[in-house]
């Protein structure tokens, strides 16, 4: 039995691998890792594939300095800027996505956090939406406090999104206007408020494979439910506009390792899919069991109809 199969069997027997073991796996053959990750997904998660969509509920003018982000005031980009969308626009989008076969819908807003007034506004929208549509509600409104997160829960939100973005060690290389600890504090408060949590990051920022593995282990310690992994799509005008893109092999290895580290969780293919020549099909054979469909915040995505067709052809149930 080779090393990949040895660790696969360890996971299938109910144990978890250590960081040292994950680092060993990171040096192994990509195809073997991907195949084993797919076996783990099939054995522990089954054929269910979770599909979500997002709407950019408030765009641009963000005071944070995340180097990858087109919405930051620190960078000159061509993105559209607007205040919080009206409830009718959000509700119409959610119902449309639900009718297209999407399971989850999230309103994502720019900025470190939304204001108290905006919390009240979105909660009212979520309450209205809950009465009109059965789609599961997610929210991504920045570094909210416990009381604000409780209000979201009471208005019908099931899952809160707050990405770690990268490892604790690498975080200050991409952002200095807020901290890694502020993010983990928000995640812990969301869990305390009774919300599920969606948290992952971006790969291709200049981090090492060890950074990605460290992030995965932090997410495991936090016990988040869904792990969205974005592939950096360098945007002109941002600090990372000339960042070298990762190879598909490197991307595949990363996704497979996340399945080894987080065997029972939703490993979600997120932004950057448009960079992949197969729309992420290879990754869906390498441990992925969830995806964000449709357009991302500031970049184009994959149409939901095309996603569902591909996902079903791969043997998943949507």
UniProtKB/Swiss-Prot annotation:
Looking up Pfam families in the UniProt record yields:
BATS, Radical_SAM
GO molecular function (one): iron ion binding
Catalytic activity line of the entry: (4R,5S)-dethiobiotin + (sulfur carrier)-SH + 2 reduced [2Fe-2S]-[ferredoxin] + 2 S-adenosyl-L-methionine = (sulfur carrier)-H + biotin + 2 5'-deoxyadenosine + 2 L-methionine + 2 oxidized [2Fe-2S]-[ferredoxin]
Q: What does this protein do?
A: Catalyzes the conversion of dethiobiotin (DTB) to biotin by the insertion of a sulfur atom into dethiobiotin via a radical-based mechanism.
Q: Where is the Radical SAM core domain?
A: 44-273
Would I find Magnesium among this entry's keywords? no
Whose protein is this, by species? Clostridium botulinum (strain Eklund 17B / Type B)
Complex and partners: Homodimer.
- PROSITE patterns from the entry? RADICAL_SAM
Record-annotated residues binding [2Fe-2S] cluster?
A: 106, 138, 198, 268
Q: One GO BP annotation here?
A: biotin biosynthetic process
Pathway info? Cofactor biosynthesis; biotin biosynthesis; biotin from 7,8-diaminononanoate: step 2/2
Statement: the UniProt record of this protein carries the keyword 4Fe-4S? yes
User: Which CDD domains has this protein been placed in?
Assistant: Radical_SAM
Family assignment?
Answer: Belongs to the radical SAM superfamily. Biotin synthase family.
Among NCBIfam families, the record links this protein to: bioB
Query: Binding of [4Fe-4S] cluster: at which residues?
Result: 62, 66, 69
Q: How is the cofactor bound?
A: Binds 1 [4Fe-4S] cluster. The cluster is coordinated with 3 cysteines and an exchangeable S-adenosyl-L-methionine.
Cofactors (names) = [4Fe-4S] cluster; [2Fe-2S] cluster
This chain belongs to the protein called Biotin synthase
This protein's UniProt keywords: 2Fe-2S, 4Fe-4S, Biotin biosynthesis, Iron, Iron-sulfur, Metal-binding, S-adenosyl-L-methionine, Transferase
Q: Report the EC code(s) recorded for this entry.
A: 2.8.1.6
What's the name of its gene?
bioB
């Amino acid at each position: 039995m080779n090393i990949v199969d040895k660790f696969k069997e360890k996971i299938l027997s109910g144990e978890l691998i250590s960081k040292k073991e994950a680092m060993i796996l990171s040096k192994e053959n990509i195809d073997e890792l991907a195949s084993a990750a797919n076996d783990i997904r099939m054995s522990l998660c089954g054929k269910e594939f979770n599909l979500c969509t997002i709407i950019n509920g408030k765009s641009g003018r963000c005071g944070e300095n995340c180097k990858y982000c087109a919405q930051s005031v620190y960078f000159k980009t061509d993105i559209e800027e607007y205040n919080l969308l009206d409830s009718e626009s959000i509700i119409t989008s959610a119902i449309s996505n639900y009718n297209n076969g999407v399971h989850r819908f999230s309103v994502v807003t720019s900025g470190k956090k939304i204001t108290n007034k905006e919390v009240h506004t979105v909660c009212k929208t979520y309450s209205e939406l809950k009465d009109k549509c059965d789609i599961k509600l997610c929210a991504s409104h920045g570094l909210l406090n416990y009381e604000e997160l409780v209000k979201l829960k009471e208005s019908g939100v099931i899952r809160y999104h707050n990405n770690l973005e990268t490892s604790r060690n690498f975080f200050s290389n991409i952002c200095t206007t807020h901290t890694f600890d502020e993010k983990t504090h928000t995640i812990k408060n969301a869990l305390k408020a009774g919300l599920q949590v969606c948290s992952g990051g971006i790969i291709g920022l200049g981090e090492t494979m060890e950074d990605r593995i460290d992030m995965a282990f932090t997410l495991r310690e936090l016990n988040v439910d869904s792990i969205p992994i974005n592939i950096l799509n360098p945007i002109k005008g941002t600090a990372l506009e000339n960042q070298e893109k990762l190879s598909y092999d490197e991307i595949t290895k990363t996704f497979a390792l996340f399945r080894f580290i987080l065997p029972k969780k939703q490993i979600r293919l997120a932004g950057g899919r448009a960079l992949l020549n197969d729309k992420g099909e290879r990754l869906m054979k390498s441990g992925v069991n969830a995806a964000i469909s449709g357009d991302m915040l500031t970049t184009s995505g994959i149409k939901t109809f095309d996603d569902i067709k591909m996902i079903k052809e791969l043997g998943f149930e949507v």
